[in-house]
Amino acid sequence: MIKRILGILIPLMTCATLFAQDYVMFQTSILKLRAGQNHSLQQGVKKHNDKYHNGKDSPKAYLWYINTGPNSGNYSWAVGPTKFSDMDQSLPDDHVKDWERNVSPYADETEVVYMMRDEEMTYNPKNETVGENVLMKRIPIKNGQAHVEAVENAVQKIADVLKKTNAKIARRVYRDAFPDGHQEIMLVYPFSSWSEFEGNVRGLPEGFQNSYEKIHGNGSFRKEVMDVLSTHSDGVTHEVMTMVK
């Protein structure tokens, strides 16, 4: 937060392509809770967001509680959509002091990531930008161009099938604009109820594997998606995040 964050939960070569056109980007960070002070942190962030990130004079800010995954029990704070040019503006003293008064006593801000949306791999039929409740799948890709291309191809094929079948869900794909050591793809699936996870569904529509194999052939989903991710990534984490209002 002490960094300049009037903007805001990708590989550099891809970024170079996207920067030349309009883009959707969020600045996200993890708020690591101190001493279990959930209520105090939630109220403090709400006060700060209402005053300085209400979407009127600057990009809007959001807070999610992280229910699952390596950061479970903590919070994801995000500002956006924003542009890189927003970062050229220094925060006024009162803005910084408000954060120090309302947020810093209850949490440490870590893991700042600039998430840039990859429109080609995104399936977003209702053209939504922010989901109140989301499942975020993080895919850290192994180093090497062959690994990157293999994972990108698998993610793109899923997007193509979602489009061909007019799926009712959305899947927004983001990249880290400043990867640290390895490239990462983040898949964001909005959901309205936890009941959507019944039947071992984790974001994709019920029966998606069958839909995929009708297009690409029997056994293709395991070969072209599951085996590819197993071989070319360091695993997939699942973060279920619910918005704090």
Describe these PLM feature segments.
Residues 1-24:
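Bacterial Sec-dependent N-terminal signal peptides
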Residues 20-245:
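Short S/T/G/P-rich N-terminal loop/turn motif that feeds into the first structured element of a domain
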